[in-house]
Amino acid sequence: MIFSSRRRIRGRWGRSGPMMRGMGALTRVVGVVWRRSLQLRVVALTFGLSLAVILALGFVLTSQLTSRVLDVKVRVAIEQIERARTTVTGIVNGEETRSLDSSLQLARNTLTSKTDPTSGAGLVGAFDAVLIVPGDGPRTATTAGPVDQVPNSLRGFIKAGQAAYQYATVHTEGFSGPALIIGTPTSSQVTNLELYLIFPLKNEQATVTLVRGTMATGGMVLLVLLSGIALLVSRQVVVPVRSASRIAERFAEGHLSERMPVRGEDDMARLAVSFNDMAESLSRQITQLEEFGNLQRRFTSDVSHELRTPLTTVRMAADLIYDHSSDLDPTLRRSTELMVSELDRFETLLNDLLEISRHDAGVAELSVEAVDLRVMVNNALGNVGHLAEEAGIELLVDMPVDEVIAEVDARRVERILRNLIANAIDHSEHKPVRIRMAADEDTVAVTVRDYGIGLRPGEEKLVFSRFWRSDPSRVRRSGGTGLGLAISIEDARLHQGRLEAWGEPGQGACFRLTLPLVRGHKVTTSPLPMKPILQPSPQASTAGQQHGTQRQRLREHAERSR
């Protein structure tokens, strides 16, 4: 029995689970619709405020109406009881031969002969009468009428010689419901004679109920009308705003000819005119910028191609002079070396400009092959390793033991890595540079981390801009052109990969290259974190011991390159 009870409890919770999930889903949907629909919020707010106002007005009006109706009833009751007291006094003092019971009953019958509460539900002033002569010592009380319906609290006022009234619920043979009971002492020969009149409040209750129903019906109709009016009014505002939103979205997608229709001369029309003026200005500026950009790209491409021929001629002449520099005096020999060095830098700049122009023209293509990315890292280290040795900068390399095969353009990937490592050496401030590689099932990532000056907030995007430098006064050991990172991010995008940067002032910077292992795969995650979780001291000797083999390989590369 215990286990079956537990099963029933789980069954109840199990049935409530989908209901709770359904309620949660419904709440989320309503929340989304509420946040996204201005028209719904306007209508709902109008409905809520109107409902609150109607309820408040209904309560006030109903209270005032009830008070007025009862005040009228009380005045009628006071007038009626004054006449009734005169009638009762005359009957009781009339004939001494009648008994007290007979006199009281006769007086009650006389008072109620013209007002029947059972049939006077719709008559104003219908009442029943109660007469009471309290007992004195052994003598019992003498009464006439439904004395048990008179509240004791009201009788206390009458016994004290005061006229008073009270609202109470009565139950008699002909009536059951709320009633006004008014009482007064009499000045007859019978001592302490109490007179009470019971006025049913059926008519007044029916009047108040009718008014409440009418007000409720009218309030509902008014709510519907106000909500409809709010819907129509808000629609007059929301429709142009939605139209402007759709046109703005299409404008952002490149449809520069989209404009808002102008109707009338109201605020919405002025909004449409202002929007169209803004769109026209933006369209004109965008067109001009596109023309300037095309002209700039065409100029860069043309100049780069035109400079190739004279540069080749100058290069041949410079190489010829350099080959015979041993026959020259030291001054001319030094000038020859400077000329060859500057020609190398100029040729690098020209090649970068040509590469940028290819990316701008959309004609850059990949020459994909399956290669071991560890070899790409080692090749890049071999090309720029001499810069680190000349500056006394330690390169810490951490790569997987197994091969990391990826379908990439080896030339472009090696250029990316070479640019990242050279950039880290330039900004490391003689502190070590850490290169890490990791791979998962779909992607491979390489991070280049330095502990130098770092990046200020917002510069992690600017570093990939063309010719941008965080500190123009800083000397570049690598002799870069200012286009390396701009070309690198274009090469990464060409592989459908990512090249991202992170940095903090005084904490250094980290560049992360993430590439798909298979061509065409979309990169969504990276095996390596962007922001370093742990930042060990870059001067730790243990790191140098762990990566001694890699540094030895780097030195061998540097020796072979010489």
UniProtKB/Swiss-Prot annotation:
E.C. designation(s): 2.7.13.3
Reactions it catalyzes: ATP + protein L-histidine = ADP + protein N-phospho-L-histidine
Localization of this protein: Cell membrane
Record's compositionally biased regions (Basic and acidic residues): 553-562
Region forming the signal peptide: none
Membrane-crossing residue ranges in chain numbering: 42-62, 213-233
Gene Ontology annotations for the cellular component aspect, listed alphabetically: plasma membrane
Lineage: superkingdom: Bacteria
Plastid in keyword set: no
Role summary: Member of the two-component regulatory system MtrA/MtrB. Seems to function as a membrane-associated protein kinase that phosphorylates MtrA in response to environmental signals.
Name of the molecule in the record: Sensor histidine kinase MtrB
Species, as recorded: Mycobacterium leprae (strain TN)
Phylogenetic classification of the source organism: Bacteria, Bacillati, Actinomycetota, Actinomycetes, Mycobacteriales
Gene that specifies this protein: mtrB
